[in-house]
Amino acid sequence: MTVSEIFQTMDYGTAPENAAEALAWIVDQGSRFGHFIDGSMTPLGEVFESRNPATGEVLAHLSQATQADVDAAVKAARTAQPKWEAAGGHARAKVLYALARLLQKHSRLFALLETLDNGKPIREARDIDVPLAQRHFY
């Protein structure tokens, strides 16, 4: 038996990463995403489509930021900064550590979303991109 024949008769199991989980999460969120500014999601304005580059399927509709959105985000950040600074290093570290742990807890979902949105191999998203994002907060 040749290698080619072996490959043609091999049975493959399902991959541990399944896009259905990420697609269901997107649908559960309403498939429409605004901006997170000043502690809450903003209403949608003009939107653009996020498409799976492998299939062309529309994954979600994302709000296109306007100058007013950017101004609101900067204003919220400036308002929050004194309180954040006054919290002290230990309190800020606890918040950032908690954020890193949430990224870690949901790493498979983030990897699937990244793969669907960018078309990159799941291995790259799972083993490089998501862990790198987590390390930014440790």
List where the protein language model places each region.
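Terminal low-complexity tails and localization/encapsulation signals of metabolic enzymes
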Residues: 1-61, 94, 98, 131
